[in-house]
Structure formats: C-alpha cells, structure tokens
Regions:
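Short, structured beta-strand segments at or near domain termini in extracellular proteins/domains
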Residues: 461-476
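C-terminal motif of bacterial Sec signal peptides marking the signal peptidase cleavage site
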Residues: 19-20
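Functional-site microenvironments in short loops/helix caps that host divalent-cation chemistry
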Residues: 25-33, 55-56, 62, 67, ...
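Short, P/G- and charge-enriched loop/turn segments at secondary-structure junctions
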Residues: 41-43, 76, 420-422, 451-456
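A short glycine-rich, aromatic-capped structural motif
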Residues: 45-120, 134, 139-143, 147-280, ...
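Pro/Ala/Gly-rich low-complexity, hydrophilic intrinsically disordered segments
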Residues: 102-109, 471, 475, 482-486
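Bacterial N-terminal signal peptides that target proteins for export
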Residues: 1-8
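A short, compositionally biased domain-edge/stem linker segment
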Residues: 34-47
Length: 491
C-alpha cells in the first residue's frame, strides 16, 4: 500500500513538473519605486505568415543515416542536433516564381536605360532626392510606369534587351544581359572578436599584451561589369579599416541555363525541354531547374529586397530569405517523427499502389510513377510539416558546403558549415550539399538523410531549390503564432 501511495505521489510530482515547465513568474513589472523591474518593450512583434511558406517548429533530430549504406559501404555521419524554428517554402520555387525575378531584372534594366542620355535621358525614372529635397543615392522609381507607346529613343531601350537568332529569325530576351547586383552584410565575420576595430577588444586575456598596431586582414567579395558586359567577381584580401569591409557585393547573371537538358543527358533527344521547359506557360507550376547555387542565392536576395520594400517600420525585424542549411533541410524533410522518407512508412507506394513521390522506380522506367521528367509541384501529399516534394521531383540546393565529415564537423546547435569560395580556390572547395533526390534518381537517393553534392556554378536539369526564413523571434510564444501560411493556389 505504501508503495502505491509513493508511486502516486511521484507520478503527481512528475506530472506537475511537466505541466509547469513554462509556468514561471509573470514578467509584468510591479512599478515599485527603487526596484529594478525592467523596461517596457512595447507590444511584441507578430510576424506575418509569409506567402506560400509553412512554419517548421524548432526541435531535435538524429541527423544522418542510422542504417549505413550496405551497397557502397559508405559511412554517413550520425549526430544528435537541435535547430531553431524557421519558415520554409511549401514547394520548390517554380518556373512562374523565377520568371517574376527575371522580369523584374529585365524591367530594372529598361528603366535604367530610359534614364540614360543615350536613350533619351528621362530622369523621372530615377529618384535622386528625398521628400525634403535632400540628395540620396540614385535609385529607380518603380511607381513610374513604362511607356505603352514608346518614342524612338524609348523603343531603342526596349529593343536593346532582345536578340534575334540569325538562323531561325526567332526573337527572344538576351539572357546574357540579365545581371542582378546585390549586397550581403556578413554579420558573423563582423561579430568575430579577432575582427574588432578596437584592438583592445580582440583578446580578453589580461595576461597578453595587445599590439595596438596589429593589422587584421579580412576577405571581401566584390564584383563589377566591364565595358564589354563581362562580370568580374573577385575576393579581395585587405587590412580591416571599418564596418564596410564586411559588406560583400555580388553580380550574378540570373537567366536559367536551358541547355542543361541536353548537356546532362548525352545521346538523348531532349531538345523539346531545352526550348519549352522554362518559356512555355504549360510548365509554369513546375520546379525551376538549370539554376546554379549562385543564382539561387541571388533569387533569395531579390526576394528579400522585394519584400522589405513593401513593409513599414517593422521590416527591421523580418529576417532575409536564404537557402536552408543542410541540417534544416533534413530536419524539415523527416517530419515530426523523424521518418526515413517524408512520409510515415518505409514503402514508396501507398495501399492503393500510388507512389508517394516522383522518382525513378525501376531501371530505365521513369514513367512507372506517372511522370517522365519533373512534375507539377505539390501534386503528391505533404509531409507532417506541411511540405511538398521533399523527396524526388528535383533535388535541392542547401547553403552548406559539402564535406565527407558532414555534421561531424558542425556544432550540435543550429549546425552549419559555411565557406565562401574565392574564384581562385580549388574547384573541390566549391561543392555544395544537395538534398532530396530527383525525378531521375532511384529509391535509395530520395531518403531524407541521403547526402550528395554539386559544384556551386553547375546548373542541372534535376536540381532546384526552395527558400527558408528564420523566425523573427525564437521565443516559445513566437513559435505558437501564425502556424498557417497564406497557401499557394495550386493549378
């Protein structure tokens, strides 16, 4: 009887402990004079749910393949890790969404040329001063519409972005001119103690005498376009002089490489995809391919710029769009139960014989799952995190550099291994982790923990991407807010 009473008491104690994990004291101040009660921070920022994204709540994961690959004898690192919550695109970025990026870049070039004296010099397309008449850095006025009936100079500005094939006579946009310039501030490098501007802050060990004349060298990415329209990207090593040294500049040609359909499959008749996959509206809701890791990052930067221009003062709280880390991707793909696949069993077909994903079921048989190449995004069921196509369709870029050590070389808190390869670096240092498998891959490659890689400048017909965005706040309250995103309309 005593044992029963003790067991009941212990059970009640444990239950009370669990239910009261976050039942701490209220943070409301009493306002008592002379006491430290904290300052009023105002109303907490309620982050609006991003369109087409779903919330992946923070959690724990045993990352990697626990069952090692017996076929190749390849060992995959396994490690327990934790990641913070983040927003993630429900589907891969589609042709339609990427076309919006392409058209924005096209229109920005047209507006810039309309303001150029060589094309008429209409200065109203540029904003050069603020509302008070004070000068500002010149930038485009997107509120001014492009002319519907252009004059001769304006027509030349429009025509300058198009080319005519001398053989077929086809007129199309000149993708070689579609360059997007963006800047990324490297907060991590700027925060490193060794990069402090004040020498006294670089080492807190009072036994060490700090050299006030020490020269700190930093690496800075920069880029420019020469008079022939060629992009030159450089990594400069120079002495640290100020906070601007951590602002990196990139210029990326953003038009997808449609020739990847031919180059990826030699002795194969894929001309139809080369000509139609990106340009034909039939493929609008298919995942964009032929996009390099560098172009995917440019899209994330543009998407951030596009969003922030539409927000008010609260824009400072919103985090930038980016590619997921390798750890975030696997955590999101494996769902709430850490499944081997993005569904709740180890089969690739459901009870009705329907496949869970678009992949290559049999040798030489791409169509067994109902598809030949890619499929429309979101036609297969979502995983427990509300994410579609986390297995198959197209493999996906991550932000993480690929190494054999994988997660073993990373921290167990928000793991990431980042390396900004300079142009002169060996090519092997430009490998980026790719996850998820694709329409051309067998079953074993679409497992959520399967790792592979591709060079960051290599476009493929089977690699796409999706974006993530860190939560504006990682507090328990924030994780409960806005669970549902504004859903995409699927066609």
């Amino acid at each position: 009887m005593k044992k029963s009473i003790v067991a009941i008491c212990l059970g009640a104690l444990v239950l009370g402990t669990l239910t009261g994990c976050f039942a701490g004291k209220s943070t409301a101040s009493s306002g008592r004079g002379g006491e430290v009660t904290g300052v009023g921070g105002g109303r907490a920022f309620r982050e609006p749910a991003p369109y087409g994204m779903t919330l992946v709540k923070r959690g724990w994961l045993r990352m990697g393949l626990e069952k090692q690959d017996s076929l190749w004898g390849k060992k995959t690192p396994v490690k327990d890790i934790s990641v913070d919550g983040f927003w993630m695109d429900e589907t891969e970025v589609t042709n339609s969404e990427y076309k919006q990026f392409v058209e924005w870049v096209r229109d920005s070039i047209i507006r810039t040329r309309l303001a150029d004296p060589a094309y008429g010099g209409d200065e109203s397309y540029m904003i050069t001063e603020d509302k008070n008449g004070d000068p500002v850095t010149p930038h485009l006025d997107w509120n001014k519409r492009l002319p519907r009936k252009p004059n001769e100079d304006e027509q030349r500005a429009f025509e300058s972005l198009y080319v005519t094939n001398p053989v077929t006579g086809e007129k199309s946009i000149d993708g070689r001119q579609l360059n997007y310039r963006f800047e990324i501030y490297d907060y991590t490098s700027a925060a490193l103690r060794r990069n402090r501007l004040n020498p006294q802050e670089r080492n807190l060990n009072t036994d060490i005498t700090v050299d006030p004349n020490e020269v700190v060298m930093i690496s800075k990415d920069t880029a420019y376009v020469d008079e022939n329209g060629v992009i030159h990207s450089e990594t400069i090593n120079r002495p640290l002089t100020g906070p601007w040294d951590f602002l990196n500049t990139y210029i990326i040609n953003i038009y997808p490489d449609t020739t990847c359909w031919v180059n990826d499959f030699r002795n194969s008749d894929n001309e139809i995809y080369l000509r139609n996959y990106f340009s034909n509206p039939t493929y609008n809701n298919y995942p964009v391919v032929g996009v390099t890791w560098e172009q995917a990052n440019a899209f994330c930067a543009w998407r951030t710029e596009y969003l922030l221009k539409g927000l008010g003062k609260e824009a400072r709280y919103v985090q930038r769009y980016r590619l997921p880390t390798e750890a975030e991707w696997e955590f999101a793909a494996r769902g709430k139960n850490q499944d081997e696949f993005p569904w709740d069993n180890q089969n690739v077909k459901n009870g009705n014989g329907c496949f869970y994903a678009n992949f290559k079921p049999d040798r030489g048989n791409y169509t067994k799952d109902g598809n030949l190449i890619t499929s429309k995004v979101g036609i297969y069921g979502a995983n427990s995190n509300g994410l579609y196509d986390m297995a198959g369709n197209v493999a996906e870029w991550t932000s993480t550099i690929y190494t054999e050590a994988g997660v073993d070389a990373m921290n167990d808190l928000n793991p990431q291994l980042d390396y900004k390869a300079a142009k002169e670096d060996p090519y092997r240092l430009k490998k980026k982790s790719v996850r998820g498998g694709s329409w051309k891959d067998p079953e074993s490659y679409i497992r959520s923990a399967w790792r592979t890689w591709e060079y960051q400048n290599q476009p493929r017909s089977y690699i796409g991407f999706r974006c993530v965005r860190s939560l504006a706040s990682s507090s328990s309250e924030a994780a409960k807010e806005n669970k549902k995103s504004s859903k995409k309309k699927r066609r």
